[in-house]
Amino acid sequence: MSSPVSKPPPELLEPNPGKSYGIMEIAIIAAVITAVALVLVCLLFLMLRYLYRHKGTYHTNEAKGTEFAESADAALQSDPALQDAGDTSKKEYFI
C-alpha cells in the first residue's frame, strides 16, 4: 500500500481573528486621547489662572469723598451728583 501524499493546509487570506486592532488604529486612538487630555489640561490651567487673578475683586460705584462723612445721610447730601436746585426737604434717598 502506498501512503497518501499530504498537502499543506491552504493559507488563509483573512486576518487573524484574535487581532482586533492594527497598529495604525491604535496610533489614531492614542492621538485622539492625548489631544483630548491636552485640551482638558489647558482649560483647567485657564480656569485656575482666571480664578487666581480675579480673587477678591470687588468694584463699587460709590461717590468720591463719601468715606469721610459722618453718616450715610450726610454723605448723600454732600454728593454733587444728587444736588439740584429744588427744596432739600422733599428729596428722597434710596440706599
UniProtKB/Swiss-Prot annotation:
Species, as recorded: Mus musculus
Listed InterPro entries: Glycophorin-C (IPR042192), Neurexin-like (IPR003585)
Gene Ontology CC: cortical cytoskeleton; membrane; plasma membrane
Protein known as: Glycophorin-C
Keyword Ribonucleoprotein recorded: no
Primary location group: membrane
Localization per Swiss-Prot or TrEMBL: Cell membrane
Annotated family: Belongs to the glycophorin-C family.
Listed transmembrane segments: 26-46
Membrane topology annotation: Single-pass type III membrane protein
Cytoplasmic topological domain: 47-95
